[in-house]
Amino acid sequence: MRLLDEPVNLLLSIPALLWAISFHEFCHGFAAKMVGDPTAERQGRLSLNPLAHFDLVGTLMLLFVGFGWAKPVPINTRYFRHPRRDIVIVSLAGVAGNLLTATLTVFFLRFFGRAWVSLTGEPGFAVLWHMIRINLGLAAFNLIPIPPLDGSRVIEAFLPYKYLYHYRWLEQYGMFILLVLVASGIINLFFDPIFNALWRLTMWQLLSIGS
């Protein structure tokens, strides 16, 4: 999933990269607002502007490694009426946004792909291909249950209360653990199965729709 294999490939991936990051965080903020938390909106993060969600390290990771993250949308669980349920909704909203984008791109490619390619050529096809790959990559990466990724919030919501203290203690080291796993390549043991499952499902949609 590396994007820096060639300069042209990098340039063609930029629209998908900006959209995937922006929409992912927007969905978090929108879901939080729907369950009662106005924090993201008040801080100007309920936006599709990539600059509102830009994280230098996470973006460089996306470019050089193939997966990464944006600046997390601020969430205040004190506003949640049903904290455990609502944190799952908010945490999975970003992933859902990326999967929705990938699915809609597949639909577009399936029904309008020939016309699109005839108008835009190989670069136009590459833009759509990156839109699918990057959104699936961001979704898969965020499903990994390691703090501070979205998957960890889902795990936290289902943990018995007696384990929450220990899990939240681990969170303060989450970013360090994550970077070590990425640098060592161990992260692929988590990432690859999730991404491959999402990729196979997406390709099945592409091949089966309208057949």
Which residues fall in each region the model found?
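Hydrophobic transmembrane alpha-helices and their immediate loop junctions
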Residues: M1-S211
